[in-house]
């Protein structure tokens, strides 16, 4: 119990003075106690290293460790486990979503390649049809041109033949007239037209 100096002084002053014998005995006891206390203070060790305190220290250590274990197992570890489990589920969901997106991308690429192949095939078909159509149109135009040219050549040949026939007819007439005039100049008489015509035709043959 802690006692202040003033309280101890007041208590001492209020007590009656001891007798001479009692005073001597008290001094002797005080002297022996002081010596014993001095001896005890001089030979004392640090309390944590005092073997007499080991049992209590081990007890408190066990209690502290038990409380720490309970705190870790009931509070900290479940929270950490919950966080890890949540994180694992989130990672699994992310991986699943990534796989789904990859599958969608693969499907889109396959569809694009299929559409591209179909477009190329259709373009080739259209080009081939246009080429065939152009070839057919060219053949038709060439045939039309050849027919027109042949018709014009035939017309030209007919015209030339007509001109030639007319020219030959004119030449025959001129020859007959010339022959008749020559005969008339030579013989002094007019020649027979039928005879002159027969003679000119015979000479042309």
UniProtKB/Swiss-Prot annotation:
Residues 1-26 are annotated as: Disordered. The keyword Magnesium does not apply. GO terms for cellular component: plasma membrane; proton-transporting ATP synthase complex. F-type ATPases have 2 components, F(1) - the catalytic core - and F(0) - the membrane proton channel. F(1) has five subunits: alpha(3), beta(3), gamma(1), delta(1), epsilon(1). F(0) has three main subunits: a(1), b(2) and c(10-14). The alpha and beta chains form an alternating ring which encloses part of the gamma chain. F(1) is attached to F(0) by a central stalk formed by the gamma and epsilon chains, while a peripheral stalk is formed by the delta and b chains. HAMAP family: ATP_synth_b_bprime. F(1)F(0) ATP synthase produces ATP from ADP in the presence of a proton or sodium gradient. F-type ATPases consist of two structural domains, F(1) containing the extramembraneous catalytic core and F(0) containing the membrane proton channel, linked together by a central stalk and a peripheral stalk. During catalysis, ATP synthesis in the catalytic domain of F(1) is coupled via a rotary mechanism of the central stalk subunits to proton translocation. Component of the F(0) channel, it forms part of the peripheral stalk, linking F(1) to F(0). This is ATP synthase subunit b 1. It comes from Brucella anthropi (strain ATCC 49188 / DSM 6882 / CCUG 24695 / JCM 21032 / LMG 3331 / NBRC 15819 / NCTC 12168 / Alc 37) (Ochrobactrum anthropi). The gene is atpF1.
